[in-house]
Amino acid sequence: MAGRSGSTDEELLRAVKAIKILYQSNPYPPPEGTRQARRNRRRRWRARQRQISAISERILTAYLGRPAEPVPLQLPPLERLHLDCSEDSGTSGTQQPQGTETGVGRS
C-alpha cells in the first residue's frame, strides 16, 4: 500500500482479518426442516448479516477515519445538461448512413 508506513499496514490487515472472521462466523443456514423453519433461519441470518455489516463499517471508519463509501461524484450544473430528442437520431446513440434500414426481415 503505497504511501503508508508499515505499522499502519499491519493495523489495516488486522482490521480486515477481524472483519473476515465476523463474516465467516455467520454461514448461510442449511436447507433443512420445514418451509417456516427455513424462512425463520434465513430471516435471522439476514439480521445477523446486517449487524456484521454495521460492525464492519464501524471498524473501518475507526481505522480510516472516514466512511468506507466512495466520495459522491461531482456532476455538472443542470443548466449545462440537455437531452437530444430529435426524431432522426438513433436509439442507441449510433448514427447510421442515410437511406439504410435496420430490422429483421427487411431487404
Swiss-Prot record:
Compositionally biased, Polar residues: which spans? 88-101
GO molecular function terms noted in the UniProt entry: DNA-binding transcription factor activity; RNA binding
Q: Superkingdom of this entry's organism? A: Viruses
State the post-translational modifications: Asymmetrically arginine dimethylated at one site by host PRMT6. Methylation impairs the RNA-binding activity and export of viral RNA from the nucleus to the cytoplasm. Phosphorylated by protein kinase CK2. Presence of, and maybe binding to the N-terminus of the regulatory beta subunit of CK2 is necessary for CK2-mediated Rev's phosphorylation.
Q: Where is this region: Disordered?
A: 24-48, 82-107
Q: Where is this motif: Nuclear localization signal and RNA-binding (RRE)?
A: 34-50
Chain positions with Phosphoserine modification: 5, 92
Compositional bias segments (type: Basic residues): 36-48
| Intracellular or extracellular location(s) | Host nucleus, Host nucleolus; Host cytoplasm
Residue numbers covered by motif Nuclear export signal and binding to XPO1: 73-84
Q: Where is this region: Homomultimerization?
A: 18-26
Listed GO CC annotations: host cell cytoplasm; host cell nucleolus
Keywords linked to the UniProt accession: AIDS, Host cytoplasm, Host nucleus, Host-virus interaction, Methylation, mRNA transport, Phosphoprotein, RNA-binding, Transport
Q: Name one GO biological process term.
A: mRNA transport
Indicate the quaternary assembly: Homomultimer; when bound to the RRE. Multimeric assembly is essential for activity and may involve XPO1. Binds to human KPNB1, XPO1, TNPO1, RANBP5 and IPO7. Interacts with the viral Integrase. Interacts with human KHDRBS1. Interacts with human NAP1; this interaction decreases Rev multimerization and stimulates its activity. Interacts with human DEAD-box helicases DDX3 and DDX24; these interactions may serve for viral RNA export to the cytoplasm and packaging, respectively.
**What is the annotated role of this protein in its UniProt record?**
Escorts unspliced or incompletely spliced viral pre-mRNAs (late transcripts) out of the nucleus of infected cells. These pre-mRNAs carry a recognition sequence called Rev responsive element (RRE) located in the env gene, that is not present in fully spliced viral mRNAs (early transcripts). This function is essential since most viral proteins are translated from unspliced or partially spliced pre-mRNAs which cannot exit the nucleus by the pathway used by fully processed cellular mRNAs. Rev itself is translated from a fully spliced mRNA that readily exits the nucleus.
Other remarks on this protein = HIV-1 lineages are divided in three main groups, M (for Major), O (for Outlier), and N (for New, or Non-M, Non-O). The vast majority of strains found worldwide belong to the group M. Group O seems to be endemic to and largely confined to Cameroon and neighboring countries in West Central Africa, where these viruses represent a small minority of HIV-1 strains. The group N is represented by a limited number of isolates from Cameroonian persons. The group M is further subdivided in 9 clades or subtypes (A to D, F to H, J and K).
The domain section of the record reads:
The RNA-binding motif binds to the RRE, a 240 bp stem-and-loop structure present in incompletely spliced viral pre-mRNAs. This region also contains the NLS which mediates nuclear localization via KPNB1 binding and, when the N-terminal sequence is present, nucleolar targeting. These overlapping functions prevent Rev bound to RRE from undesirable return to the nucleus. When Rev binds the RRE, the NLS becomes masked while the NES remains accessible. The leucine-rich NES mediates binding to human XPO1.
Belongs to which family?
Answer: Belongs to the HIV-1 REV protein family.
Instruction: Output this protein's name.
Output: Protein Rev
| UniProt source species | Human immunodeficiency virus type 1 group M subtype G (isolate SE6165) (HIV-1)
